[in-house]
């Protein structure tokens, strides 16, 4: 069908126009109309937009925009020439690799495995970066400014980086090989293999490091004596720390014996102050009745073990450990100096965009959602300690704004207050998910082990005491 006739047909189409039945059915199938309708040129163009457009050849593009076409073609050939030069250089370097039997982690045989490993680390880094930005309130919130977040096309940065590292590694090895060949040409014969010298001529082994300086160790008896004294002192201190002496506490077997011995002690103390002989005689008569207790106490067959019970117990010497106390104090000082800026930070300034990421489609926050389920183990410890610090401050005091900032951030502040109200709807569930088992004594005591990367053995093993009990609905 000719385009001119088709255009004329579309302009003069009317329902009263007589047309053959086969043509009418054909148009009805194409246009999906039960009956012929009025069609215009704009409707026809709109229908044609559903199909793929025709790609013009390069000759047509050269006539339409010659400057752009010329720049694209020149860029294409430059890239191609650059790629050919790099490929030639790579082939030469690979030949040298095969001759010298070098190995690289970025070689072609192992590139796929290391590429997957780097991609996995990159993915974890992005997740860690996003989650750490939620915790760190002092940094900028614009996560899109990082190259990884700008667009999906920038995902190729990692692959390009691997190629650059590989090219740099190959180029350096090629340059080192050239330098080694030049040095061999000046000093030795090129056709002489130096790796055969060590096992063909054993005399060369002693002449390998002729000009190397040798240090003769000097024996100092005083240093040996000091080291021996230090080891002895360390062993003594270790024995004293490991020795848990029990405290002996004697308890009378019966209350009657305890009362009788108490009366004897009171009478003996009173007799030292009495000067009247009659009173002394009367007291001595009363004491004779209970003197048999002393005989029983000092008899071998009965003695102290029969009249009393030993209720000794071992007391842990946790708080007597000077190393433990020193580590606790240094950890708290580091903690205070490191997070002083975070304590002074206003929580209403830059937390809107972070909370917005955890909103659902209905603008509500799920009650069963916990940040600890998506954080890394190290970041979980940071979240717990930061929450323990922020919980000490009143939100109403932090919500005081200036008049200028209140007018600018009125909408965002209202939204944050509404979100906080949604969080506090179910108090029992929030206590279960955040207070326990998040805040425990071993987390605050062992934060130097996870946060400051310092270890103190198993000294905190006895401090695992839960501050909060189990809470049931």
UniProtKB/Swiss-Prot annotation:
Its main location: plastid. One of its GO terms (cellular component) is chloroplast. Keywords: Chloroplast, Plastid, Protein transport, Transport. It is found in: Plastid, Chloroplast. GO terms for biological process: protein transport. It comes from the Eukaryota. Belongs to the TIC214 family. Involved in protein precursor import into chloroplasts. May be part of an intermediate translocation complex acting as a protein-conducting channel at the inner envelope. Part of the Tic complex. This is Putative protein TIC 214 C-terminal part. It comes from Anthoceros angustus. The lineage of its organism: Eukaryota, Viridiplantae, Streptophyta, Embryophyta, Anthocerotophyta. The gene is TIC214.
């Amino acid at each position: 069908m000719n385009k001119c006739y088709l255009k004329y047909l579309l302009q003069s189409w009317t329902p009263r126009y007589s047309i053959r039945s086969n043509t009418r059915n054909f148009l009805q199938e194409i246009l999906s109309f039960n009956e012929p309708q009025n069609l215009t040129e704009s409707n026809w163009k709109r229908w044609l937009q559903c199909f793929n457009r025709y790609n013009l050849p390069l000759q047509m593009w050269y006539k339409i925009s010659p400057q752009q076409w010329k720049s694209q073609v020149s860029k294409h050939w430059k890239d191609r020439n650059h790629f050919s030069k790099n490929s030639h250089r790579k082939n030469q370097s690979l030949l040298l690799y095969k001759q010298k039997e070098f190995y690289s982690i970025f070689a072609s045989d192992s590139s796929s495995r290391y590429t997957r490993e780097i991609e996995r680390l990159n993915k974890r880094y992005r997740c860690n970066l996003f989650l750490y930005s939620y915790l760190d309130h002092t940094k900028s919130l614009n996560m899109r400014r990082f190259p990884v977040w700008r667009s999906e096309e920038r995902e190729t940065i990692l692959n390009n980086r691997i190629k650059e590292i590989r090219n740099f590694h190959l180029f350096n090895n090629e340059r080192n090989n050239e330098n080694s060949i030049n040095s061999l040409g000046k000093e030795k014969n090129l056709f002489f293999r130096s790796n055969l010298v060590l096992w063909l001529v054993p005399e060369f082994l002693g002449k390998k490091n002729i000009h190397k300086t040798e240090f003769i160790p000097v024996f100092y008896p005083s240093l040996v004596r000091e080291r021996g004294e230090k080891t002895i002192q360390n062993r003594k201190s270790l024995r004293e720390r490991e020795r848990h002496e029990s405290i002996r506490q004697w308890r009378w077997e019966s209350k009657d014996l305890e009362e009788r011995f108490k009366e004897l002690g009171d009478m003996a103390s009173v007799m030292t102050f009495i000067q009247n002989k009659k009173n002394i005689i009367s007291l001595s008569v009363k004491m004779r009745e209970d003197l048999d207790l002393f005989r029983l106490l000092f008899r071998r067959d009965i003695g102290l073990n029969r009249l009393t019970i030993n209720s000794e117990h071992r007391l842990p010497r946790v708080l007597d450990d000077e190393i433990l106390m020193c580590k606790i104090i240094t950890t708290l000082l580091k903690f205070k100096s490191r997070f002083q800026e975070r304590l002074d930070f206003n929580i209403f300034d830059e937390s809107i965009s972070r909370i917005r990421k955890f909103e659902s489609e209905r603008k509500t926050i799920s009650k069963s959602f916990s940040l600890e389920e998506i954080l890394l183990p190290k970041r979980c410890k940071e979240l717990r300690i930061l929450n323990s610090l922020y919980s000490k401050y009143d939100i109403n005091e932090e919500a005081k704004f200036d008049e200028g900032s209140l007018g600018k951030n009125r909408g965002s502040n209202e939204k944050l207050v509404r979100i906080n109200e949604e969080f506090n709807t179910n108090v029992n569930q929030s206590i279960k998910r955040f207070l326990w088992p998040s805040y425990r004594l071993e987390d605050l005591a062992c934060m130097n082990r996870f946060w400051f990367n310092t270890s103190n053995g198993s000294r905190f093993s006895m401090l695992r005491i839960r501050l909060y009990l189990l809470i049931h609905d």
